[in-house]
């Protein structure tokens, strides 16, 4: 169970890293670069730990799914990106797929 928690945290850190890259695109600063590096390094470390007991394909799919869905949600909530029913449906589909992979593992 701890490995799955670390996988969820890894996905959240990937999501944060992508949000930080968006922030860096708006304001070039060493601070953002350092935060991006730390965020992604922590994300990869936790992903590596999770892969000790979780199959690689499952771990990677869940990790990227969290990052993809989370990045889209951050865009909608904080950066005024388009939010329509189709977009929300497919974000939900990504999350349901991650849950399905957890159930199968």
From Swiss-Prot:
GO terms for cellular component: plasma membrane. Disruption phenotype: Deletion of both gdnC and gdnD leads to a decrease in the concentration of guanidine required to inhibit bacterial growth. Keywords: Cell membrane, Ion transport, Membrane, Transmembrane, Transmembrane helix, Transport. Coiled coil: none annotated. Induction: Transcriptionally regulated by guanidine, via a guanidine-sensing riboswitch. The keyword Transmembrane applies. The efflux pump is composed of GdnC and GdnD. This is Probable guanidinium efflux system subunit GdnD. It comes from Bacillus subtilis (strain 168). The gene is gdnD.
């Amino acid at each position: 169970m701890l490995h799955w928690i670390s996988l969820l945290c890894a996905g959240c850190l990937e999501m944060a890293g992508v949000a930080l890259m968006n922030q860096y695109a708006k304001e070039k600063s060493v601070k953002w670069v350092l935060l991006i590096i730390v965020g992604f390094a922590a994300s990869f470390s936790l992903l590596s730990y999770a892969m000790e007991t979780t199959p690689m394909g499952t771990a990677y799919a869940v990790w990227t799914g969290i990052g993809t869905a989370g990045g889209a949600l951050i865009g909608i909530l904080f950066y005024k990106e388009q939010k329509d029913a189709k977009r929300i449906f497919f974000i939900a589909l990504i999350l349901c797929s991650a849950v399905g992979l957890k159930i199968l593992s």
